[in-house]
Amino acid sequence: MSSKAETTELRFSFVLETPAAEPEEARRHFAGKLQFETDVADLMYDLQKGNTDFTIIDTRSPKSFALCHIPGAMNLPKINAETVAELPKDKMCVVYCWGVACNGSTKGAMKLNELGFCAKELIGGLEYWRKEGGAVEGTLGNDAPMHWNMNG
């Protein structure tokens, strides 16, 4: 027979340690998340269906953008009133950078919001886009590095 301490240890659960939110509270939370971000699969689907009701913005450096970027994306490493003057305010902006460890898209989306644009961040950025087989454009295309470096 096992001791009570061993039984308690076996029954402990990190998943169940904190109770789940009530369904309506959880629904509001998840609906809120979807207002701020979109994922690679949703963007791929829309692009494959020809939906162009949004603008894709890459916040990485011009050099990195030239090497590899999502088709149709525009490069805006600096977002301010001057650089977005030609952007249509009636289109949502989908903003990305390298990946989950890069906050360039978060900063870019925030700056776009400050300038009156609606923006969502692409979860996982270019890294997840490429890992999920998304098409890329650029001088190196799929041969481009998968991460940021000091030279680009």
Name each model feature, range by range.
Residues 117-152:
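A generic hydrophobic-segment detector
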